[in-house]
């Protein structure tokens, strides 16, 4: 595959991916941040240029030194042609199947491609599918033709009021990574904690400090520009903190011109209710992640 290098080509890629939203969302969000300084030192590969059919975003080889670190060994894929995608990935060394890795996409149709490739590479695959939400201002800007966008009310959804005497708005610090790691569904280990620290250093974060002066609720961003890892300490749940956090984080990113989206588990009815109240739009085909391990 062809490695796109230099700001001009990456900006052209971003513009082209924008025409394929929402299916290209995970890759579009990643390329957007590659064009804003590329804090995760990622690279973009295409099957051909400029009339590409398949795009793969991945870390530089030197970043992927730990074969068991699937948080770092993460690939984002978008394809206009699934046969082309399978052929491009099968006949190249773009994906290092000897490592523990993750593939992410906002195309559920990639499942067959990933499963077929994994079978030939002797790799075990676990597919996780979640609800993928786009925030209202991002939908108005990037997805104006969606019926749900046309029905959006003016302005932002109102978050639940919080006790602003008790909870103070702040930003996360890398020293808070252990706390985030403890409550992150996909975390709980040393590698995930290092990934969280990197996200805190690289992207805008928000938290509400509780009476003790430590985070009671928080939300972060990952290398694809997605709001992730949000949580509230058990003793402060039920006070509307995560709703407030999402609203504040979203508004701040909107003002910076950053596309805003997030995902939640299909079983997480609380976050789904929050998203509904804040007028988030669920995207077809959802959020997809394939965790791959060599057999």
Curated annotation (Swiss-Prot):
* UniProt keywords, alphabetically: Acetylation, Acyltransferase, Mitochondrion, Transferase
Catalysed reaction, written as an equation: phenylacetyl-CoA + glycine = phenylacetylglycine + CoA + H(+)
Q: Which GO terms describe its molecular function?
A: glycine N-acyltransferase activity; N-acyltransferase activity; phenylacetyl-coenzyme A:glycine N-acyltransferase activity
Asked if the keyword Acetylation belongs to this entry, the reply reads: yes
N6-acetyllysine-modified residues are where? 43, 48, 80, 182
Q: Does the keyword Lipoprotein apply?
A: no
UniProt-annotated location(s): Mitochondrion
* Chief site of localization: mitochondrion
What family name appears in the similarity comment?
Belongs to the glycine N-acyltransferase family.
Q: What is this protein called?
A: Glycine N-phenylacetyltransferase
Q: What is the scientific name of the source organism? A: Bos taurus
């Amino acid at each position: 595959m062809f490695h796109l290098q230099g700001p001009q080509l990456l900006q052209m890629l971003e513009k082209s991916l924008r025409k394929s939203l929402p299916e290209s969302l995970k890759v579009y969000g990643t390329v957007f941040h590659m064009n804003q300084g590329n804090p995760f030192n990622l690279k973009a590969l295409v099957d051909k240029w400029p009339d590409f059919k398949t795009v793969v975003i991945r870390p530089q080889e030197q970043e992927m030194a730990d074969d068991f670190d699937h948080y770092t060994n993460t690939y984002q894929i978008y394809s206009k042609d699934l046969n082309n995608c399978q052929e491009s990935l099968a006949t190249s060394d773009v994906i290092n199947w000897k490592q523990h890795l993750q593939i992410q996409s906002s195309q559920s149709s990639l499942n067959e491609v990933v499963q077929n490739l994994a079978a030939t590479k002797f790799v075990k695959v676990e597919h996780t599918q979640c609800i993928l939400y786009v925030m209202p201002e991002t939908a108005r800007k990037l997805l104006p033709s969606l019926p749900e966008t046309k029905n959006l009310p003016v302005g932002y959804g109102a978050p639940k009021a919080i006790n602003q005497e008790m909870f103070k708005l702040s930003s996360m610090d890398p020293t808070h990574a252990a706390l985030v790691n403890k409550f992150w569904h996909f975390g709980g280990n040393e590698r995930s904690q290092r990934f969280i620290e990197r996200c805190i250093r690289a992207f805008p974060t928000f938290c509400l400090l509780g009476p003790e002066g430590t985070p009671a609720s928080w939300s972060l961003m990952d290398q694809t520009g997605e709001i992730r890892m949000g949580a509230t300490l058990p003793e402060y749940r039920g006070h509307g903190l995560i709703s407030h956090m999402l609203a504040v984080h979203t508004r701040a990113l909107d003002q910076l011109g950053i596309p805003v989206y997030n995902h939640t588990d299909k079983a997480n009815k609380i976050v789904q209710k929050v998203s509904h109240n804040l007028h988030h739009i669920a995207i077809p085909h959802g959020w997809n992640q394939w965790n791959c391990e060599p057999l």
